Amino acid sequence: MSNVLLIFNQLRAAGVSRAGALGLLGNWKAESGLEPCRLQNDFSANRIYSHAYTADVTAGRITRTQFARDQKGYGLAQWTYFNFSTGQGRKLELYDFWKKSGKALDDVSMQVAFALHELTTEGQYASLWQILRTTDDI
């Protein structure tokens, strides 16, 4: 099954409206080309830098701290943000979510699950979550 269908079906199963799911798909298409291993600014043939980066994170050659702080967008949503004052950030949370999931870092369903986790547990996304569930307009 294509990434488009996997993502769409997972979003719909979580309660996102058809238009909301299509809107997220459009955003993630622009962010990553819907490639879950996509590293920011990797325009190489076959995404060789993205695959090498993913392998290095998976093998521990890039540590949790390095992954979180390198300011390189990663994955479907190009998670990047890190707050050096608080030591928290979206990419750090992606890393921790991935480790607990038991799935591959570049697993599409894991990344969609993480996005849904952000949308439903982070107060700053409450209004966006409401829109994604109820909108009928892309």
Predicted regions and their residues:
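Peptidoglycan-targeting cell-wall enzymes and recognition modules
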Residues: 2-6, 32-133
